[in-house]
Amino acid sequence: PDLADMFADPYPAGPVVAPAPNADPGRYRTAVFFDAVYGDCRKGEVEKHLVAVPWVPKHGGGTVRFSPRAGAAEALAAVSRELDAGPAEWRKYLVPASGTYNCRVIAGTDRVSAHGWGIAVDIATRATDYWYWSDPKGRNVVFRNRIPPEIGAVFERHGFVWGARWYHYDTMHFEYRPEILGLTRRK
């Protein structure tokens, strides 16, 4: 994908609803752009800059490693503080965090995952829904989401897109994409 592809599907505001077929707002990434901003993990340019971000410390979440570039770590810290102040029943979705930095490609592709730039966090492994588990060929994807939309809204307020907004959904996945959400907020 190129830069125009990244903005092809407008990121929705408001309630979480089943996305239109093949609408994946914020899921497309241009590696050249992200390598320039965050570094290329395959060349060792990301890991050496990662910082420890406290993750919902009142709930015993420990720390997670995240990129400090472009305000990503600051944004995640703000998410953490807001989630920490949320209802106690959110804890089961937040602790433990299921993963942040991991220099890897997206399954079945040669494209680097957002985790490889240190800008993605996965939560709630036990309560996650993922399109591939329901329809590996992607022909009859049935939308499912068990993560409270209020949790997703916290991330979105701080510049993260949520995989529950994608037709090819990945409800545990949040990635720092201020370029996508900044455009959405201006409309």
Where does each model-flagged region fall?
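Cell-envelope/glycan interface and biosynthesis
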Residues: 1-166
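A cross-kingdom marker for long, charged
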Residues: 161-187
